[in-house]
Regions:
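A beta-strand edge to alpha-helix "cap/lid" segment located at domain peripheries
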Residues: 1-26, 33-137
Length: 137
């Protein structure tokens, strides 16, 4: 089951890299209880507001490339999966290549109707004094 949570996490970052709101919609739970905290943003509550935040991000930033490191995954009662990781990100922002690091916590809930893990919480915090890992890009 841990591998299933890690696969759901990979789907989340695939959606990000592909700048795909459709893929992002597929991995998030659609209710008013989900939460997203992007680095430097206020807390966003509810799927519709979270969807709008992804639309804004996808409009302003392109060509995301993620290298995920330092992954730690835990399961609670086979219903909740918590994954922490470092997002090593390369992107194009305002015509410039940018490298940044974000420590992320992604919480997944098992959806028995869909028989899969869906993200219910994402929190990203910037890494100060970030140095990308060797060979990450």
């Amino acid at each position: 089951m841990i591998k299933d949570v890690e696969n759901a996490n990979a789907e989340f970052y695939d959606a990000f890299e592909n700048v795909s709101i459709n893929m992002m919609e597929n991995i998030w739970i659609h209710n008013d209880n989900c939460i997203c905290i992007h680095p430097g943003w206020e807390m966003i509550v509810g799927w519709l507001a979270i969807r709008e935040s992804w639309m804004t991000i996808f409009t302003n930033m392109k060509n995301f490339k993620f290298t995920i490191t330092n992954t730690k995954t835990r399961l609670y009662e086979d219903v909740v999966g918590v994954l922490t990781c470092v997002e090593n990100i390369q992107m194009i922002q305002n015509e410039r290549k940018v490298h940044t690091g974000v420590v992320a916590t992604n919480i997944f809930e098992y959806d028995y109707n869909q028989k899969r893990w869906l993200i219910v919480y994402h929190h990203g915090s910037p890494v100060s004094d970030y140095l990308p890992p060797a060979n990450s890009y």
